[in-house]
Every structure is written in C-alpha cells, then in structure tokens.
Amino acid sequence: MQSIPIKNVGESRLVDPFQRQYYYLRLSITDQCNFRCTYCLPDGYQPEANKPSFLTLKEITHLAQAFAEMGTEKIRLTGGEPTLRKDFISIAESITNIDGIRQLAVTTNGYRMAKDVADWKQAGITSINVSVDSLDPKMFHQITGINKFDDVMRGIDRAFEVGYNKVKVNSVLMKNLNDKEFEQFLAWVKDRPIQMRFIELMQTGEMDSFFDKFHLSGQVLADKLLKNGWTLQHKSHTDGPAKVFTHSDYTGEIGLIMPYEKNFCASCNRLRVSAKGKLHLCLFGEEGIELRDLLQSHEQQGILQARIFAALQGKREHHYLHIGDTGVRNHLASIGG
C-alpha cells in the first residue's frame, strides 16, 4: 500500500500539479456483475476469498461528503453492476442529500432497469448510462453472455416513461463484432433522445490477445461523422471524456471515447474510488491509495481530505497506453471502468 503524508489542506480544491480541476468522482460500490462481457469479465464474476467486503453505506456517505467539500459536483455509481447491491437506493438517497452534489449518475447493464428505474429516479439519480454493445439480440448475447437484450431495451423505454429526458448508451467498439452496426445505431437514435457513445476497446493485463484481435480506433467513426455533417460540441466542466457530435437531422447524439488519442488526458476531471475504498488517480495507473481507514467517523474527515489532496499531487500528466503500459489492472471491473 502506498503511504501518503498528512497535512491540513483547509479549503483546498482538488487541483493537480498540471492545474487540472477534479469535479467528478467515479465511485464503484461493488465488483460483482451478473453479465459475462467478453471484453471485461468473460469468465463471469469471481469473488476473491478472504478479501475485504465492499464499502458500507456509512463509509460511502463519509467519502462522498469529503469529496463534496473539496469541490466534487458529480458522482457516478459504478461497479461491477451497482444495482445488484440491496442498499443501492439507500446509497443514492444518501448521496443526493449531500450539499454540493449536483449530479448523481449510474452506469448499469440495464438488467433491472425496466423494473426499478422509477425508484432510481425517486432516489435522486439524475442520469443513466446503459451498456448496449449490439442492437442484434444474437450478437448482444454473444458479447455479454446473457440473453437479456429485450429486457434492456424495455428498460431504456421505461426510463423515458418515468421522466428521464436523455439516456446515454455505451457500446464498446470491437472490430468484426459490432463495428458493422454503426449505421444501425445511427438510425436508432434518429428520433430518440439517446447519446450513443462508442468506447474504444482498452488494453488490460488479462486481455492482450483480445485487444490485438478486436481493437478499432474511434477515429474511423469520427471521420465518418464529420464527413456526413455532424458537429463536435463543447464540453462542460463536469462532462466525461466523450467527444460529443450532434446533427440537425437527429434527435440523438453520438459520443466517442478514444483513450489512445493524443491529449486525451489533458481535460481529465475525474477520480476513482474502488468498491473496497482505494483511491485511483487513473484508470491505467497505480495500485491505489487506501482511504477506508479514514471512513469510519466524521471526525476523520479533515485527515481524509488531506490524504486525497496529497495523493492528487502525484497524478501523472497522462497515461502510457501508447507504449503498452496498461498499469496494474487485470480487468476494469475492479474500479468501475
């Protein structure tokens, strides 16, 4: 475990040595997932024996309060599949009630969405990202290992019914698997308020051969969009890494997440905390800085904030994916991708 010196940061905001400000926390609340996606957990979730349990509701609340006081405005609940937690609604309600948190998002596989999305809305979830890697039910099954395409589609429709104005849909771009569906995805968002986001396949320790076989640059899609009249939009300070394109003939939008692009890290605005309480400065970075020992009481909050601030001063200017350095992560489910 990396040790971090303690000092009093007072009212310091989350700013790194490169003057990037961090308004956005991606908080994993479980490693567990009920899908077996080929690019993430192809063998399914494998619980680790004798490992610490996931953060409790109380610990999550202390953590979110500390980040909010340091300037965090947006928290995204991730996993694993975050909605598998029995106290998911309680977690959402607790974070919603914290001063300074303006947006509470969730990334989900959509498995429980049709049944539960009204409760998510009531609990304060302001935006939803759903994973849909194919619009072909057979290909969806092949990629996810689960035959639940129709359920996920019903969940997206239900989200609009209960009052969400937009749903973001994530698709991991894979050569010769779903890249041929680009036109189909465009047609799908033509009259729907969906931001369809294509995420470049990312290399991790366990997936080198899979990456070599299926990686496709998102620039291929960017070139198609620009050629066909789509316009790149400006980001707000709490937006994620996607480049978002709009077109006057389309209700929906297209987002591209291209981590291998030059200067991808220049606009980084997010930090990550794992389901077991480690702070990660980068998706492709270090083993993590322990925070859980300082999540046991409100009286520890000043020391907790000092540790977070000190850790941030060691954040690198950029990742090293371009030279094959994927960090220590075997797969991305462990810190919420």
Swiss-Prot record:
Pfam families registered for this protein in UniProt: Fer4_12, Mob_synth_C, Radical_SAM
Residues the entry annotates as binding [4Fe-4S] cluster 1: 33, 37, 40
GO BP annotations, alphabetical order: Mo-molybdopterin cofactor biosynthetic process
Domain Radical SAM core: 17-243
Signal peptide: none
Obligatory cofactor(s): [4Fe-4S] cluster
GO molecular-function terms, A-Z: 4 iron, 4 sulfur cluster binding; cyclic pyranopterin monophosphate synthase activity; GTP 3',8'-cyclase activity; GTP binding; metal ion binding; S-adenosyl-L-methionine binding
Enzyme Commission designation: 4.1.99.22
Catalytic reaction list: GTP + AH2 + S-adenosyl-L-methionine = (8S)-3',8-cyclo-7,8-dihydroguanosine 5'-triphosphate + 5'-deoxyadenosine + L-methionine + A + H(+)
Annotated GTP binding sites: 26, 76, 107, 168, 270-272
Cofactor comment: Binds 2 [4Fe-4S] clusters. Binds 1 [4Fe-4S] cluster coordinated with 3 cysteines and an exchangeable S-adenosyl-L-methionine and 1 [4Fe-4S] cluster coordinated with 3 cysteines and the GTP-derived substrate.
Annotated S-adenosyl-L-methionine binding sites: 39, 80, 131, 202
Alphabetical list of PROSITE patterns matching this protein: MOAA_NIFB_PQQE, RADICAL_SAM
Pathway stated in the Swiss-Prot or TrEMBL entry: Cofactor biosynthesis; molybdopterin biosynthesis
SUPFAM superfamilies hit by this protein: Radical SAM enzymes
InterPro entries linked: Aldolase_TIM, Elp3/MiaA/NifB-like_rSAM, MoaA, MoaA_NifB_PqqE_Fe-S-bd_CS, MoaA_twitch, MoCo_biosynth_MoaA/MoaC, rSAM
Residues that, per the record, bind [4Fe-4S] cluster 2: 265, 268, 282
Subunit composition and interactions: Monomer and homodimer.
Record function comment: Catalyzes the cyclization of GTP to (8S)-3',8-cyclo-7,8-dihydroguanosine 5'-triphosphate.
HAMAP family: MoaA_B (MF_01225_B)
Similarity section: Belongs to the radical SAM superfamily. MoaA family.
Name of the molecule in the record: GTP 3',8-cyclase
Organism: Haemophilus influenzae (strain PittGG)
